């Protein structure tokens, strides 16, 4: 049986790999990091956009469309904060990018709460500033 330290290290590696693959847009590899029944939540999703995705297929379909929405020039200030529960990790990061439809800057800060199970991402909740999104996408 794995120790809390080993589980925590595994969770850190999982989320580091997550960031690497999503930034590179290697979605077919990226989705393999997720549990089959994973849940992905966006509590501040824009009206008309999904706030909850369930399962690999829904999550992959959603994320494959993001390059048509946001052109990411870089990820900055990436900070990984392990939780007391070794399966939980809080992630902070800033994305520098451009909204594809408007050409406006999309410089967004995120806070993510991720929970792993059996070495896979089981639950993911992503928070961002909806005012930045509204400005970038002219909503």
Located regions from the model:
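Short, low-complexity N-terminal intrinsically disordered segments enriched in polar/charged residues
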Residues: 1-36, 138-139
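Short, cysteine-centered beta-strand-loop-beta hairpins and adjacent loop/turn segments enriched
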Residues: 97-107
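Short beta-strand segments enriched in hydrophobic/aromatic residues
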Residues: 34-35, 93-97, 112, 128
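A solvent-exposed, acidic/Ser-Thr-rich amphipathic alpha-helical stretch
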Residues: 33-86
């Amino acid at each position: 049986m794995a120790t809390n330290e080993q589980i925590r290290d595994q969770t850190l590696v999982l989320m580091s790999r997550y960031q690497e693959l999503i930034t590179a847009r290697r979605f077919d590899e990226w989705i393999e990091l997720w549990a089959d029944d994973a849940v992905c939540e966006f509590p501040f999703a824009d009206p008309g956009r999904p706030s909850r995705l369930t399962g690999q297929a829904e999550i992959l379909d959603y994320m494959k469309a993001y390059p048509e929405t946001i052109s990411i020039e870089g990820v900055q200030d990436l900070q990984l904060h392990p939780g007391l529960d070794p399966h939980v990790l809080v992630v902070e990061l800033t994305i520098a990018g451009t909204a594809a439809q408007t050409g406006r800057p999309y410089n967004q800060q995120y806070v993510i709460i991720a929970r792993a199970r059996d070495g896979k991402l089981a639950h993911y909740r992503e928070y961002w500033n909806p005012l930045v999104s509204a400005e970038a996408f002219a909503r």
